[in-house]
Amino acid sequence: MTDKYRIDSHKLLYHVSRVNAWLGGENIYPVYMEISPSGACNHRCTFCGLDFMEYQNRHLDGNVLMERLSEMGALGLKSVMYAGEGEPLLHKRMVEIINHTKKSGIDSAMTTNATLLNEARANAILGAMEWIKVSINAGTSGTYSAIHRTKAADFNTVIGNMSNAVRIRQDNGYKCTLGMQMLLLPENKDEAATLAKLARDIGMDYLVIKPYSQHLLSRTDRYREVKYSDQLCLADTLREFNTGEFSVIFRLRTMKKWDQGERNYARCLALPFWSYMDAGGGIWGCSAYLGNEKFYYGNIYEHSFKEIWEGEKRQKSLKWVHEELDPLQCRVNCRMDEINRYLWELKRPPAHVNFI
């Protein structure tokens, strides 16, 4: 199926100069960062990987965050995805933060449940964003309510909000890509086609169908044993919904990797290229290890990003990861899995690479 955004792969190959600097031993700044503006969430999804963070009612200080965004943009950060431990739109200054991100020269995106993406917010942010991806894990309100553990009416609210977002984008000539995402579970597998049709009909650009991934620290493990080998044929059914303007991105490669549980790399090499900021201002090397001091770099309330990124804590963390961390003990299909596969191959090329 069409995946022009390379969602089932990676895009680091487009950042040749940054990769080359890393290969040359430079202390590069990240290309991408995930930021959690809010620790609170208005849903309690059955599959939530960050439930161990306990949906704390904490929010990043807007002034400090925007100061750091200006700094990070100047240092070379290319993109930010607002998502994290909670629902980003619960942050009262999210509109202002998104617009400041763009002014800082950083591409911004958001993963959201979209219940709070009303017309006013959509009007205020669509012109400043590269993409918005909605987590909507069912094709009917009943199943949606059961999985998101919220009121069934939220389903129609989300559909209405995204329909309005499409209209606002068209009326204003905005370029923001609008998509949806379903995490394929036993409870919703029979509604993937229903959601695909609905997403296409309201004007979404794509629907991602992705596999579950067990977070190492998550309190929920009800889907730990789920396999996708008997669901792969669903790709053929969903392909029928593709048009010139809409595509279903069925993450076949990632599903197979989940079932196999294997990696082709013996070390995590991706950490210099990305970072995670939690809702308390903490900077981490990996979102799969939130709370593990070995991955903690510092806090934006205490230090500038430059001080954190070039600081002793981060250097010790990178050294430990390089020498001791075994990726086989990490989360399967982690955020940086495809990046690691790519970098491992660059570091250990096969024979005959000069015969291009």
Where are these regions (language model features)?
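Radical SAM enzyme [4Fe-4S]-AdoMet core and its adjacent flexible, acidic
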Residues: 1-7, 36, 60, 74, ...
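N-terminal pre-core extensions flanking Radical SAM catalytic domains
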Residues: 1-56, 70-73, 255-263, 272-274, ...
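Short, contiguous clusters of charged residues that form electrostatic/catalytic patches at enzyme active sites
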Residues: 17, 63, 67, 96, ...
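Hydrophobic packing within well-folded, soluble alpha/beta domains
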Residues: 41, 45-48, 97, 101, ...
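Residue-level recognition of short loop/turn positions
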Residues: 44, 85, 112, 279-280
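Active-site-flanking alpha-helical
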Residues: 50, 94, 286-287
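Residues that line or immediately flank small-molecule/substrate-binding pockets and catalytic motifs
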Residues: 52, 84, 136, 211, ...
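Conserved Radical SAM active-site core
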Residues: 54-111, 115-128
